[in-house]
């Protein structure tokens, strides 16, 4: 085996960031593109050092005419490498990027669960991280959206998603594939400029590189890395603040299905008033995530946060689903909208 600088870098990253334990089962998501081929080749070469059992999973979205041929191509690669292969095909074509991503992670989790894989590994790179940060920035987001692709995150209670290539650019994965003559399957949808992410990749980032910083891609990805550490700290601190400020009391019906129907949730305003605005907002977002069916937006978070310093008996307009929040002295009370006071 030829040991390259990229092999050494990924080996070092896995060890220093504690991405995997040795002698575990890793399910590698392989589309057939350059990033996933680079990933599986690196893991196969590192396998003797770590004692992993590797499997390859391919998800066929059925949104290209050549998708079946693409799946067969990946299956043949897996057979040539002597690696278990798993194929999941969408029952109907998946038409949006968001829907495709959600279906893909569900499919990968199901395969991993059925075949006892502890890790799902994807080939997301620093280039993907930069694109995701820019995409979220233009949609409007906080630091949580700007941290853009984390090294690890749990998909289920016992399956961890891992992205070992987040410090590697797409240019590097292309060079690696060329060096080892890996047969890349070109995905024609990556060239389709109707997708916002493709416009960022094909037009915006090259413009930034040509006119502002040749290393713009890495610089933006490094910003995401710095923000990730900040977000993790703020989330932990906000969780502690929430636990300090939050109380349950017997009273009117509270909306959270996970709570006993006889309990009301109330928040101590004096505790929250001592905290900086950044933590106040995070506490309110965490609370709203528990009681709303969909993710809270900026307006929802702001109107609940405003009650921390609002006059007595101030209250919000109803949130989606009917919940309202009202100030009662030193407390913010979350209650059913039908109980709204006049």
Curated annotation (Swiss-Prot):
Catalytic activity as recorded in UniProt: cytidine(34) in tRNA(Ile2) + L-lysine + ATP = lysidine(34) in tRNA(Ile2) + AMP + diphosphate + H(+)
- The answer to keyword Signal applying to this record is no
Going by the UniProt record, its keywords in alphabetical order are: ATP-binding, Cytoplasm, Ligase, Nucleotide-binding, tRNA processing
Major location category of this protein: cytoplasm
List the Pfam families hit by this protein, alphabetically.
ATP_bind_3, TilS
| One GO CC annotation | cytoplasm
Where does this polypeptide localize? Cytoplasm
Indicate yes or no for the key word Nucleotide-binding.
Answer: yes
**What are the recorded GO MF terms, alphabetically?**
ATP binding; tRNA(Ile)-lysidine synthase activity
Q: Tell me which EC number(s) this protein carries.
A: 6.3.4.19
Q: An example of a Gene Ontology BP annotation on this entry?
A: tRNA modification
Q: Where does the secretion signal sit in this chain?
A: none
Sites where the protein binds ATP: 31-36
Gene3D superfamilies attached to this UniProt entry: 1.20.59.20, HUPs
What family is this? Belongs to the tRNA(Ile)-lysidine synthase family.
Q: What does this protein do?
A: Ligates lysine onto the cytidine present at position 34 of the AUA codon-specific tRNA(Ile) that contains the anticodon CAU, in an ATP-dependent manner. Cytidine is converted to lysidine, thus changing the amino acid specificity of the tRNA from methionine to isoleucine.
Q: Which PANTHER family match?
A: TRNA(ILE)-LYSIDINE SYNTHASE-RELATED
Description of its domains: The N-terminal region contains the highly conserved SGGXDS motif, predicted to be a P-loop motif involved in ATP binding.
Mind telling me what this protein is named?
A: tRNA(Ile)-lysidine synthase
UniProt organism field = Nostoc sp. (strain PCC 7120 / SAG 25.82 / UTEX 2576)
